[in-house]
Amino acid sequence: MYWNYPVEESDGIFAAVASAAFDKILGGIGDVDVTKLVGAFERGAEEGRLIAWMRNDDEQNAIKETGIDASLPDPDDPSADPVAGVYFNNLSFSKLDWYLNADTQIGQGIKNGDGTCSYRITVTLTNIMTQEEAGKLPDYVAASAPDAARDDERLNVSLFAPTGGNISDLTVEGTQFGLGAATWHGIPFYSGTVDLHAGETTTITYTLTTSAEAGDKPLTLRQTPTCQAARDSASA
């Protein structure tokens, strides 16, 4: 679409498609296959694409029970299930996330003498765009942030520890960038901005240690969802 139509025409086409899809949903809501609908909601929740917030406390508690609240850890509860947060946000004002591969690997947990548990985590971010594709990017897709090249996948990367935990021994290989330490309501995290041009990769490796209060609860990962699965499926 973006490669074949100018911006003005593509905007109109997308508006028409969205309107037709919405009319179809509302007009055929009585014919919906409930099983498929529930499956779609479950997949969206599992991938972190479906999140919700309710102003009413009772409703918000119900949302939390379903696991789609996407809230950061409770800073006052170090005994909660430990979660490693790996988040990134596009700062290039673009649609280049289609070319972003994000792979996070969590190593085997090592129990420490003080009751904490340490995990070695590796986050690999890659702009899989080829040089040929970079040379043909339409304006609607290319980066438009100040001082950014057209193929620049500029990302803010944030790595969160669980409540009562910490991050240490952090290294960056490949495309270099700085990660600064900070806290959010007492929860430690590292954050920085990386520029990935066509074909470039950065690999972040660090040790995440959970709290002693979390005991033997396994560490889980919460990561910003990407287009990776949809892109690979479309090209299969």
Enumerate the language-model features and the residues they cover.
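Lumenal/extracellular ectodomains and adaptor appendage modules
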Residues: 1-236
